Amino acid sequence: MVISTEVGALLLFLLVLTSLYFITNLKQRLSKAGIWSHGNEDPELSDEIYAKAALSVPPKRPGEKRIVWIMHSYVPNVLAGSEITAEDQIAFLKKKGWTIYVLVNRWVVPEHKGVQIFPIQKGRLGEAPDGIRKLFQSADIIAGQNYPITDLFLAVNEFSKPVVVFLHTQNDNRESLSFRLGSPTYVVYNVNFIKLEGTNAHPSIVVHPKVNTEKFKFDKENPKYVTLINCNENKGGLLLPQIAKALPEIQFLGIKGGYAKQNVKDEDKPVNLTYMDTQTDMVKIYKDTKVLIMPSKSETWGRTAVEAMASGTPVVVSKSPGLLECVGKAENSCDRSDLSCWVEKIEKLMTDDKAYHDASVLSKERIMELDREDEYERLDIFLTDIAKRHSV
């Protein structure tokens, strides 16, 4: 059977049209289920689903310790440092007997690792539906992270609950914490330098992000790459090809991040630079990495630095205060804009065996220090004391 060109073109057009309809319909269905997200846009949320949010939460049991944690975004759809840290802290606190509910603007899944997640509408927390309001009323503590501080307090002051603000970045509107905000206020800083920059008008604690380093403690066989993880502008994505061009004999690896625009133009990169897509398992990447670089403009800690140091990988960092606090005695740093410094330090580590050995030893010693810290235990004690102090 011979099909004419016109008929073939018509069939192809109908096939494409059907495919587009199916994809659009699928997006709509996934959106209504709360599991569709495109890029960095906030997922669509139907009024029907929002009205039912948290209505299924059971009444608080006698003796139950309950936290309602408000965030802009959460895992699994955003795998940035503060979201991963919150996931780790929540998992630890659950083991300590806390019940925790998460509220997010960017709602994608209704549950993650045993934690129920409910949607809130951006900028309209004060107009939350009945289920969310009852959840606030039942809480021992309301926590906030990466959420506008003033908006948070305006929305929850009526419930007279203690509010714990988790500060992870220098960009949070911290000036709001210089004043009395109505509800009893407490602050959890993720690094010392952010606390030192603030007014410390409220009781607070510093809790560094905790990384389970055991799976990253391994011996390497002939690692060859200088690696940058997350190629956005803030992390150093524009600087990476410049360094690679200056060191043509050394192999560089850029791992695409899971958020923000990635600077990974293949046509502009030197031949000794390889880009890879976002990775879910970083063990293989670290096994192939001889030196990790972190030329970040702003970084309050450095989860990837900790993961890399666990295997003795030297890490060259910018002079961002959070990174310097993170690497501690293993510091190997450059001003972010000083290209010659990055080139010099990388070349020395990649070609001088003694320099590499000494830096590797310091990385492992720093991990021993971090592994000894019991900061999540202190967080549990801090929160338990707050709940007891304000119990009715």
Predicted features, each with a name:
Residues 184-217, 234:
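Donor nucleotide-sugar binding/catalytic pocket of nucleotide-sugar-dependent glycosyltransferases
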Residues 213-269, 275:
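Conserved catalytic-core segment of nucleotide-activated headgroup transferases in glycan assembly
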Residues 231, 331-339, 348-353:
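Conserved acidic donor-binding segment of nucleotide-sugar-dependent glycosyltransferases
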Residues 278-279, 284-289:
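Short alpha-helical donor nucleotide-sugar binding micro-motif in glycosyltransferases
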Residues 297:
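Aromatic "clamp/platform" in nucleotide-sugar-dependent glycosyltransferases that forms part
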Residues 314-317:
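Short hydrophobic beta-strand element within catalytic cores of glycosyltransferases
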Residues 354-384:
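A charged, aromatic-enriched C-terminal amphipathic alpha-helix characteristic of glycosyltransferases
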